[in-house]
Design a protein with these regions (language model features):
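N-terminal, intrinsically disordered charge-dense segments
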Residues: 3-4, 38-40
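Short, low-complexity intrinsically disordered segments enriched in A/P/G/S/L with frequent Arg
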Residues: 5, 12-15, 43-44, 48, ...
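Short hydrophobic alpha-helical segments enriched in small aliphatic residues
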Residues: 5-8, 12, 18, 25, ...
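Coil-to-alpha-helix initiation sites in intrinsically disordered, low-complexity, charged segments
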Residues: 18-19, 243
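Low-complexity, intrinsically disordered Ser/Thr/Pro- and acidic-rich segments
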Residues: 21, 28-30, 46, 53-56
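Structural and coupling elements of P-loop NTPases
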Residues: 34-37, 48, 59, 63-759
């Protein structure tokens, strides 16, 4: 376009402002000499003011300090770790693909117009057309390394978004210019807030006819607050979309025919909108500096270009300001501006200062520390590359061959090789400094583990979403149970949001996950990689049986076969024993039953109780007294008295008003207050009762209820539907209660049908 000039090439550092990133100081030192570990300072570095933000300490330099690495290692202050998160299907992966392409890492825009994606390489992702795992997309831009993590945000795979956010300093939320921010975006927004992350928003798909940038920005401000402000505006929308208006630099920007970023003067028709957006930007960021704010308020409400750029980094890192960008990932417009600002204004790894430890202390993010520490935030089981641990270096420098100790296991882990990963492709690196993210193959560490020289350093764990979706599975082919369980255990070790267990009460193999799609992917992978197929079966509820009144009966077993016979005779009294479990009492006197045969009576009773008398479920809370009987000196033996005890117990239990008990669940549901009525109605319809309700955080309502477990086996799926994906819940078994008689009759009928069918 006329007047356009080249702007910034991917590898050309942008001009730094006076308040740009400088070298950080140690936690307990207010400054260092010019000769620092691995760094030679070109100019003296002033004392750095320290600012506490949420859970971390951040450092903000007073002026830019030049430096040179003596080892050729990318230093911590030049590393930007960012996670792309947001609602599923809004273009997060395409944004990462655009970053890879524009920075020269890839030669074409992956996943667009039939090209093979770089990041969604898993066959299950190709099959489902959405991301199911996080992927790394590191790029070099503007003199910095941008470690970009593309996080899946389909609800069932949201655990990887939490893992990604635990390893970064900034969360970039991608939203659709024509859609609602969505429940997942809201959930992750508050998770990022709890982690004290800087945040930014990229409004995608401006080139679509239905795009409404202003309305989208207003919706974001209404939901997340007025600290959000535009740093780029769309230069047209729909078919008229040409590029973006850079509010910081007050220039229009677009890609030329060769795909290179260029800038020009702002078109006249956008001048007023740009001035208005800039005024709003100044108003927001000036809160980061009290002196400049006073000057701003007492003056004409303007900031110089130098003052504005000097405040941006501090305002973003302190979460005073959330920058909002406009663009189109498929057109690749607006993406270079985003990368420029990430490199220039977004917090670096060193700006987080320190990370909290389990013991309450803090660990400096210090590349000069001679005791390296690494934090594993994700494990991948890749069929091509094997087990891969994605780790963030928290302190020191890691190199191939280094041996560190895992804080959880106290076992050494040898980092034979370290790699950088782009999608599935890996390239070995000679070292990585504090703040950098690397891939380490073939170590046993799990997500959340901390590796250090002593094994005594343990970073505070981040909380994954609750995995309350449960299903029971069975192999399609008998004899493959062990192979099935082995594959599931290995897979769940790599994914903290999933677990597999054998239910001792029901004997079923149970998978716990976030949602149905997550289990479906797991089973498909098992079939493809292990050759074991399985199917989902109904979850069995661990019902119990008991009695409601006292009853007595005789059990007499007599069998004559021509030789030695069998004879056993006992009288049993059954009594309710609420909350005390099973108890057996020997009340026989006068040698009516020899002492050596009394244990056989006890054993016969317990074996019968395991089978139940009403619906085939184990009996609990019964006191059994054996108070009389008789025996034969020749024909009485252990087997005979076990059989007699069985007969006596069945008779007495039938007279003692046997009932079925069902497990009760203590349910706590957190939903936006608009959905509270639906949740309470569902609890009532599920034979439950609401026991309490209170206001929660961020406009939510917390509902406490007690519900039969049988009614909430599928509650994860039901709550997602009731709350449109906005609800969360916890559930725990909380005792047993008698089932209604109609439910008991149904269970008894099902048991009888199974017996008649020989099952």
């Amino acid at each position: 376009m006329p007047g356009s000039v080249p702007f910034a090439t991917p590898h050309a550092p942008l001009a730094r402002h006076a308040g740009g990133w400088g070298f950080f100081v140690q936690m307990f030192g207010y400054g260092k000499s010019n000769e620092c570990r691995g760094v030679r300072m070109g100019t003296p570095t002033p004392i750095q003011p320290t600012v506490w933000v949420g859970r971390v300490r951040r450092f903000f330099p007073l002026r830019w300090a030049t430096w040179t690495s003596t080892e050729g290692v990318i230093m911590s202050e030049k590393i930007r770790n960012v996670a792309l998160v947001g609602q599923g299907g809004v273009g997060k992966t395409m944004l990462a693909e655009a970053m890879l392409h524009l920075s020269g890492v890839t030669s074409r825009l992956g996943g667009h117009k039939g090209t093979k994606p770089t990041l969604d390489y898993d066959p299950e992702e190709e099959k489902r057309s959405f991301s199911i795992k996080l992927a790394m997309a590191p790029v070099s831009w503007g003199g910095a390394r941008l470690n970009v993590i593309d996080a899946p945000c389909y609800p069932d795979f949201i655990g990887d978004a939490y893992a990604a956010m635990s390893a970064v300093e900034t969360a970039i939320f991608v939203v659709d210019a024509a859609g609602d921010p969505g429940a997942v975006t809201t959930r992750l927004w508050y998770a990022a807030e709890d982690l004290s992350l800087a945040r930014a928003v990229f409004v995608n798909r401006i080139d679509r006819s239905e795009a409404q940038y202003d309305a989208t920005l207003a919706a974001l401000q209404e939901r997340f607050g007025q600290r959000l402000g535009a740093v780029t505006l769309p230069w047209g929308v729909g078919e008229d979309f040409k590029g973006i208006i850079d509010v910081i630099r007050m220039k229009a920007r677009h890609l030329d025919d060769a795909g290179k970023p260029v800038e020009c003067d702002i078109p006249a028709e956008y001048a007023d909108a740009a001035e208005e957006a800039r005024a709003r930007l100044c108003e927001l960021v000036v809160e980061a500096d009290d002196e400049l704010m006073l000057k701003y308020l007492e003056g004409d409400g303007q900031l110089t270009q130098e003052e504005l750029e000097g405040l941006l980094a501090k305002a973003i890192a302190e979460r005073i300001f959330v920058p909002v960008f406009a663009g189109s990932c498929t057109a690749e417009e607006g993406v270079t501006s985003l990368m420029d600002d990430i490199a220039t204004y977004f917090p670096s790894a060193s700006d987080f200062g320190s990370v909290p430890l389990v013991n309450g202390d803090y660990l400096d993010i210090d590349e000069g520390d001679d005791r390296p520490v690494a934090f594993v935030f994700k494990v991948l089981n890749d069929p091509q590359n094997g087990r891969l641990a994605l780790a963030k270096v928290l302190a020191g420098t890691v190199k191939p061959g280094l041996e560190l100790i895992c804080a959880r296991t106290r076992k050494p882990e040898r980092l034979a090789h370290i790699y950088r990963m782009v999608g599935r492709d890996m390239s070995e690196v000679p070292s990585a400094a504090a703040g950098d993210i690397v891939v380490v193959p073939k170590i046993a560490a799990m997500a959340g583990d901390t590796l250090s020289v002593t094994g005594k350093v343990e970073a505070a764990a981040f909380r994954f979403p609750n995995s309350l979706y449960q299903v029971a599975i069975e192999p399609d082919k008998r004899g493959t149970e062990d192979k099935l369980y082995s594959f599931l255990e290995k897979s769940c070790d790599a994914d903290p949001t999933m677990s597999v267990s054998r239910n001792e009460d029901t004997g079923q193999t149970v998978i716990s996950a976030i949602g149905e799609a997550q289990v479906s992917v797991l089973l498909d992978r098992m079939a493809a990689r292990a050759g074991v197929t399985a199917h989902i079966v109904p979850m069995r509820v661990p019902y119990r049986e008991t009695i409601r009144r006292t009853a007595s009966a005789q059990g007499r077993h007599k069998k004559q076969t021509g030789g030695a016979g069998q004879y056993g005779d006992c009288w049993l009294r059954l009594e309710p024993n609420p909350g005390a479990g099973y108890e057996f009492v020997d009340e026989v006197v006068g040698g009516r039953i020899p002492k050596g045969l009394i244990p056989a009576v006890d054993k016969g009773v317990q074996e019968t109780m395991r089978e139940g008398v009403v619906a085939g479920y184990p009996m609990i809370d019964v006191r059994v007294a054996c108070y009389d009987g008789s025996y034969h000196s020749v024909d009485s033996n252990e087997m005979a008295f076990k059989s007699a005890a069985r007969l006596g117990f069945l008779k007495a239990a039938g007279q003692a008003e046997p009932v079925v008990l069902e497990p009760m669940a203590k349910l706590m549901v957190t939903v936006p207050e608009d959905y509270a009525g639906s949740i309470m109605g569902d609890v009532s319809a599920s034979r439950g009762r609401v026991e309490g309700m209170e206001a929660g955080e961020r406009g939510t309502t917390v509902i406490q209820a007690r519900v039969p477990y049988a009614e909430v086996v599928d509650y994860a799926t039901r709550l997602r539907s009731l709350s449109r994906g906005t609800g969360e819940f916890t559930l725990e078994i909380d005792g047993y209660e008698q089932v209604p008689y109609d439910v008991q009759a149904k269970l008894a009928e099902e048991w009888q049908n199974r017996r008649n069918a020989g099952r």
